[in-house]
């Protein structure tokens, strides 16, 4: 009896679902729930994208697209245990701004940033003004100095509408147990040596 009754109920439900004169709420509810979930998914995706964009904006230099100071410091947390820190400063950049205007100066900075961004073996950042900071991969001091010379020469030959741009670089190789503040102090001293020695060169700390 129960099986017969159950069959009758199921048969009756089937007839109701197939009756064109009867409003079936199940597809409507399903569509409504699907639209809700779809809208929620889009909103969640937009929220995640906005959060990612804000994080990127907080760690990226808007002019060059390189890491800014904050982004570089965050990257240093996962930096290799061995490598080299380089502080790069464009020589006499104030004269470029004074002579050609800040718009041209910005184009120079953007061009240098694009050049550094294209060097896939290093991490490049702009700390502000005409100062850039790089992380070179592991290697001996001679190889790292040679790499810095290549970077210096690459900047000196950038096509900048007749504007000659040179850079001085302070290089500090590091190994296990390095401390970032100490490295920056040594790199700044190396950069000062490069400036004092005539600019447009690579120097190690004294």
At which residue positions do the language-model features occur?
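Nucleotide second-messenger and two-component phosphorelay signaling modules
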Residues: 76-88, 99, 115-123, 157-161, ...
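Conserved helix-loop-beta segment at the catalytic/binding core of cyclic-nucleotide signaling proteins
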Residues: 59, 113-143, 153
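Conserved nucleotide-binding and Mg2+-coordinating catalytic segments in signaling enzymes
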Residues: 55-74, 88-102, 110
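Signal-transducing coiled-coil linker helices
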Residues: 5-14, 18-62, 70-82
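Catalytic core regions of nucleotide second-messenger enzymes
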Residues: 126, 155-174
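Catalytic-core segments of nucleotide cyclases and related cyclic-nucleotide turnover enzymes
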Residues: 142-145, 172-206
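Heptad-repeat coiled-coil signal-transmission/dimerization helices
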Residues: 72, 76, 86, 109, ...
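Alpha-helical scaffold within the catalytic cores of cyclic-nucleotide enzymes
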Residues: 113-114, 143-161, 188
């Amino acid at each position: 009896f129960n099986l017969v009754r159950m069959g009758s109920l199921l048969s009756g439900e089937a007839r109701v679902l197939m009756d064109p004169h009867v409003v079936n709420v199940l597809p409507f509810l399903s569509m409504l729930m699907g639209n809700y979930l779809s809208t929620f998914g889009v909103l969640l995706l937009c929220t995640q994208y906005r959060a990612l964009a804000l994080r990127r904006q907080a760690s990226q230099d808007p002019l060059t697209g390189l890491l800014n100071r904050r982004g570089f410091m965050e990257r240093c947390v996962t930096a290799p245990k061995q490598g080299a820190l380089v502080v790069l400063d464009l020589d006499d950049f104030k004269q470029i701004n004074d002579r050609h205007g800040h718009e041209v100066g910005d184009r120079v900075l953007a061009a240098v940033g694009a050049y550094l961004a294209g060097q896939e073996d290093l991490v490049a950042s702009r700390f502000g003004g005409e100062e850039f900071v790089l992380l070179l991969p592991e290697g001996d001091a001679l190889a790292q100095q040679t790499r810095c010379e290549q970077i210096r020469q690459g900047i000196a030959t950038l096509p900048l509408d007749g504007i000659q741009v040179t850079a001085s670089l302070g290089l500090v190789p590091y190994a296990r147990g390095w401390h970032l503040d100490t490295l920056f102090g040594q790199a700044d001293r190396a950069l000062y040596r490069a400036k004092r020695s005539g600019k447009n060169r690579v120097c190690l700390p004294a």
